[in-house]
């Protein structure tokens, strides 16, 4: 089965443009399914993936307390895989065409109030005053995530050339390799300049490459490290909810909307193909993004 999964992984990467995170999740889901099938019928092949078997696997997952969002993703993984396998001639028919995807409840993570966000950013700024390279980096992580609302994976994937400091713009590569331009404000610019001038040069090694953000050993920053930075920074604010980068992203979106930003503009800034249950997707110019961001974001 591993050779089949390798081929499927290549399909997800090259033809579907799925992220590394999504591909790892899908392959893990399929390995779970194959283990379930093998336990029931040792040595079974792809022909053993019938609709009743798929339903039994999902039922077992649900009974074990698997979250609805995870069940929805696993259903999607199976449906994508079986459709691909039929096209490749690996299966005679697609058993997942009638497999129902459990509806995932939409639950928004906790968000910061504007005063809590300000306190968190002030704390990060205070910690960076001594010029410690890691403190300068941590300040930039928190400041840029809140200023732009981008995903932590997008932030850690940025190269130096993706940043236009003079125009305060980021070129972000989002899900499905979709590129978008996101503005940021003056506080984020100050944090960025301090990092590029004093922080990054102190950590850079031959392995750094073009990466904007670096870990302590000079390699591209891992998103897990960035999550730790956000948790620790926000956790120091009295009364603030325990949030990570995703919560900071939702905080940025919430504060933009509170400031009067149009929902479709926020959708473009966040890189969503849909926002909530809507099907709207509106392309806006960089100038419009800049104007709305300056008017609506509390730290523009």
Curated annotation (Swiss-Prot):
Tyr recombinase domain residues: 107-294
UniProt keyword terms in alphabetical order: Cell cycle, Cell division, Chromosome partition, Cytoplasm, DNA integration, DNA recombination, DNA-binding
Assigned GO CC terms: cytoplasm
Start and end residues of each Core-binding (CB) domain: 1-86
Alphabetical list of Gene3D superfamilies matching this protein: 1.10.150.130, Intergrase catalytic core
SUPFAM superfamilies the record matches: DNA breaking-rejoining enzymes
GO molecular function, one term: tyrosine-based site-specific recombinase activity
Chief localization: cytoplasm
Biological process terms in GO annotation: cell division; chromosome segregation; DNA transposition
Catalytic-site annotation from UniProt: 151, 175, 246, 249, 272, 281 (o-(3'-phospho-dna)-tyrosine intermediate)
Superkingdom per UniProt: Bacteria
PANTHER family registered for this protein in UniProt: PHAGE INTEGRASE-RELATED, TYROSINE RECOMBINASE XERC
Family to which this protein belongs: Belongs to the 'phage' integrase family. XerC subfamily.
Function field: Site-specific tyrosine recombinase, which acts by catalyzing the cutting and rejoining of the recombining DNA molecules. The XerC-XerD complex is essential to convert dimers of the bacterial chromosome into monomers to permit their segregation at cell division. It also contributes to the segregational stability of plasmids.
Subunit field text: Forms a cyclic heterotetrameric complex composed of two molecules of XerC and two molecules of XerD.
Protein's recorded name: Tyrosine recombinase XerC
Native source species: Mycobacterium sp. (strain JLS)
């Amino acid at each position: 089965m591993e050779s089949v999964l390798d081929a499927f992984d290549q399909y997800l990467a090259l033809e579907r443009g799925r992220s590394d995170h999504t591909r790892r999740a899908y392959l893990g889901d399929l390995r779970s399914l194959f283990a379930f099938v093998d336990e029931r019928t040792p040595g079974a092949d792809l022909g053993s993936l019938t609709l009743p078997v798929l339903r039994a696997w999902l039922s077992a997952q649900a009974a074990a307390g698997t979250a609805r969002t995870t069940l929805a993703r696993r259903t999607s993984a199976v449906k994508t895989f079986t459709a691909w396998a039929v096209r490749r001639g690996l299966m005679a028919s697609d058993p997942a065409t009638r497999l129902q995807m459990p509806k995932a409840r939409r639950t928004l993570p906790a968000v910061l109030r504007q005063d809590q966000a300000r306190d968190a950013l002030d704390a990060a700024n205070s910690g960076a005053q001594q010029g410690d390279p890691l403190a300068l980096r941590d300040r930039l992580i928190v400041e840029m995530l809140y200023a732009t609302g981008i995903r932590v994976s997008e932030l850690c994937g940025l190269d130096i050339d993706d940043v236009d400091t003079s125009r305060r713009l980021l070129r972000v590569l989002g899900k499905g390799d979709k590129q978008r331009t996101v503005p940021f404000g003056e506080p984020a610019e100050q944090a960025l300049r301090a990092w590029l001038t004093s922080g990054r040069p102190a950590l850079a090694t031959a392995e750094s490459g073009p990466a904007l953000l670096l870990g302590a050993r000079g390699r591209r920053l891992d998103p897990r490290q960035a999550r730790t930075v956000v948790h620790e920074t926000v956790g120091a604010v009295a009364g603030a909810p325990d949030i990570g980068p995703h919560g900071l992203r939702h905080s940025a979106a919430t504060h933009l909307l509170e400031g009067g930003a149009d929902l479709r503009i926020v959708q473009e800034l966040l890189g969503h193909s849909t926002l909530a249950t809507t099907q709207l997707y509106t392309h806006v110019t960089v100038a419009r993004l800049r104007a709305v961001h300056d008017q609506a974001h509390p730290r523009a």
